[in-house]
Amino acid sequence: MINEILKDAEDRMSKAVASVESAFKKIRTGRAHPSILDSVKVNYYGSETPLSQVANITVEDARTLGVSPWENNLVPEIEKAIMKSDLGLNPATNGNLIRIPMPALTEETRKNYFKQAKNEAENGRIAIRNIRRDANGSLKDLVKEKEISEDDDRRGQDQVQKVTDKYVAQIEERLAAKEKDLMEI
């Protein structure tokens, strides 16, 4: 019983951390990284398709991404999709290759991005605490139904707290890494 509750809580907490990671990927640093374009969708024969499924995305240098479409007729569509995305990027086409220079971040922009990252991290911590509350509630229900003893409940809550601390620490590590990335010039 307790192990099932712990396993469920741990699964949900790892998903919360993954969600924070994916939110962090959308926050642009000064460095070029293919995951910046993960949210870009291209009109591919009438359906919105992720850019990574219609083109190769490569890092040409520290501040430039290269996009090579698999079909030449997609070049204008990809350009349009990148311009439409709210990433603040301006693609430059050179034949079949689309180069995307990463604009340098101003100090103010860096601080705003870091604020956004802190908010995402806080949302992740809140989600983890809510999962802890749910798990502890499930343990209390088992005590009420006399399926586990008070001592088992206490041990279970301690285990839930350890798991919670582990995942909150993971979010903190990722936030620190993101801050380092953002504040690096």
Curated annotation (Swiss-Prot):
Domain of life: Bacteria
Gene3D superfamilies in UniProt: 3.30.1360.40, Ribosome-recycling factor (1.10.132.20)
InterPro entries noted in UniProt: Ribosome_recyc_fac, Ribosome_recyc_fac_dom, RRF_sf
GO cellular component terms, semicolon-separated: cytosol
One matching Pfam family: RRF
Any single GO BP term: cytoplasmic translational termination
GTP-binding recorded as keyword: no
Role: Responsible for the release of ribosomes from messenger RNA at the termination of protein biosynthesis. May increase the efficiency of translation by recycling ribosomes from one round of translation to another.
Family note: Belongs to the RRF family.
Protein name as annotated: Ribosome-recycling factor
Species the sequence originates in: Marinomonas sp. (strain MWYL1)
Gene: frr
